[in-house]
A protein has these predicted regions:
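Catalytic Walker B motif of ABC-type/P-loop ATPase nucleotide-binding domains
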Residues: 148-152
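Conserved ABC transporter NBD signature motif
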Residues: 56-67, 71-72
Length: 155
């Protein structure tokens, strides 16, 4: 479960959000809706431990994300809107990433790529935007984390 209580966050002197409280229960799929600049990406980064709130608390199960506990980190994955994949393939990308996630399932990755009709050995820079998004989603799903945070997965 993800529990957020009285969370504040600002960049320099510009408040992004103030005093928000939310609860995300296990086994559900949630979506964050809002205009650009209201803090959706920032909230995902706080939940994943990549940014730190100014005030308030964020708990994921019994962990405080900002403490970067190794067990916590292997059970959550944040897929940003844009990923720099440079001159590599989904196969090489997931092989480097998967070592950090004990439940990573390479067979599942290959099955997803086949189902999505994307070649795991094509370079990202030769793919269409849609193929790249599908490939990154297959990578994320194959990590088998308890929490999967997707920023603009279909954009």
């Amino acid at each position: 479960m993800i529990t957020i209580n009285n969370l504040d966050f600002s960049y320099k002197n510009a408040a992004v959000f103030k005093n928000i409280s939310l609860e995300f229960k296990e086994g559900n799929v949630y979506g964050l809706l809002g205009e650009n600049g209201v803090g959706k990406t920032t909230l995902l980064k706080i939940i994943s431990g990549l940014q730190f709130p100014n005030n308030g608390t964020c708990m994921v199960d019994d962990f405080i994300p900002s403490e970067r506990n190794p067990y916590f980190l292997q059970n959550i994955f944040y897929l940003p809107e844009e990923v720099i994949t440079e001159d590599t393939t989904p196969e090489k990308f997931i092989n480097k990433l998967g070592v950090f996630y004990p439940r990573y399932d390479h067979s599942y990755f290959l099955n997803l790529m086949k189902e999505l009709e994307v070649d795991a050995n094509n370079k990202f820079n030769a793919m269409s935007y849609g193929q790249k998004k599908k490939s990154l989603l297959a990578c994320a799903l194959s990590l088998r984390t308890d929490y999967l945070l997707l920023d603009e997965p279909t954009n």
